[in-house]
């Protein structure tokens, strides 16, 4: 069944207009896509605004779009940018919802079985459901995703078939609705009303869909829907009235009772065949293990239509043939969707590598009787299967890989930056006396309040260099593999803010990293050929200095390698084009002004603040916000006071939602005092 999707145009809302190479790139990309070219490469230099170009391209072609990034942090950054550029359209974020994930595994050498263990991030899970909801209900959708989009997901047809469409005046019984919601894996809970649950009070049913922040109230009169309301789940405040709404399942692995019964039949057939095979091979322990585990899962499915690890039976539930590719997020898109692969030189190999890593683990589980062979078909797509499911693809990169360049119908260049900034000057210096030279360059930059990145080849060298620079009085930090993602964000923010001047690391290229304050990138051992000193890595590293007007790259080397030569020639070519464009158009290069903030930084800060507030461990605090009021009410402007009231109100509701009622009461009292102060300011005429 093909869903009916709301049609609304994509519209970019921005105070800026395309500039530099952007207008030409947008027009050429749109022209090639419209002409039907299957694969197109956008070779965009660092800092030329490839994300903005993508948004304008989507506006030009008016097609649902999947944007692929190679890690969660970059995906979050891209989603944030697209939401700012396309505020009136659905920009969704689809990544793995696990904060922690230990997959099911077996180690034959030690006879150790590791149970699946995971911690699910409820908010990311909501965003995943929001993605599928948007894809099946509207066309103006941009989904920013990682490789999660190629992993198994329930069939779109089953998901859509399980949906409940509600309309005012519709004839439907209360008990019938309750049964439908339970079949969709919603839990009835009249006490703890939260996402994925519903409650019943007389002829009124209230439900919070897994993809929504607000609740839905269904008021019935007999067997007829009398009214539908959107309401705040905690306060019960009615936010809006609607005439029609659709409720999608609480799980992507939705299946009708008939489908489950059919699947149970084929699972039992496969189990019988596999047991015969194992017993014939003399693997009696494995056979008994498989019989017990599978029979338990079958009983669970017979009783409640679901079982833990049901995704391992997805081939049976979907009715797929052995070896057939699983359903995934790509199946939820309309047929004419566009794919944009960001940092394609990294993301393309990543997509291709996912299948084999998953298969090797499951192969061991199957061989030792922990899973049926059909569990192998709950897997990510192979590369060729991915290509079959996507249509036209745009590959974005400052350094496109051989694969993209080989299959592309054409390469579109975006070299000129909107800011007029040119690629950095590259100097090759001898290794003799390199540390003294580097120290001198660092001190010169520090005096100008500029920052420096230093990249080395080994962990030991990075540590020793950091110690040496620190002893020489340089404010320096060392970024290494053991630093977690959020701490890495903090380090980069501290670098930009001037807490320290130099960051030393091994692999600092970090595609998509924006550091406008960095005016010098020093590459030690630049002539040591290898992954970290390939032409691609060198160009990416050089790009870290391309966001500063006085950016320079110093390569310390005694030999000019082929990789160095390619990187220098490509950078020089781009620089010449940029300088010529600036001269012809009278453009004076402007420094890139970017807020010292990042979506992961913001999320981390909010998460820490919320945890601190909700913990409520310091019982001695009379007010949870003494520092905000320590200067007296006169120290607070009206706007700040109103903002504080809004923040505290949100914290109070969050505390109540977490059942932290004592904290919520303290916040309520604090709110009451602040509102009284605000009223006094109004009476005194301090508010306009």
UniProtKB/Swiss-Prot annotation:
Annotated ranges, domain Helicase ATP-binding: 31-414
Pfam families xrefs: Helicase_C (PF00271), ResIII (PF04851), UVR (PF02151), UvrB (PF12344), UvrB_inter (PF17757)
Gene designation: uvrB
Binding locations of ATP: 44-51
Protein name: UvrABC system protein B
Subunit structure: Forms a heterotetramer with UvrA during the search for lesions. Interacts with UvrC in an incision complex.
Top-level taxon: Bacteria
Stored InterPro entries: Helicase/UvrB_N, Helicase_ATP-bd, Helicase_C-like, P-loop_NTPase, UVR_dom, UVR_dom_sf, UvrB, UvrB_inter
Record carries keyword Protease: no
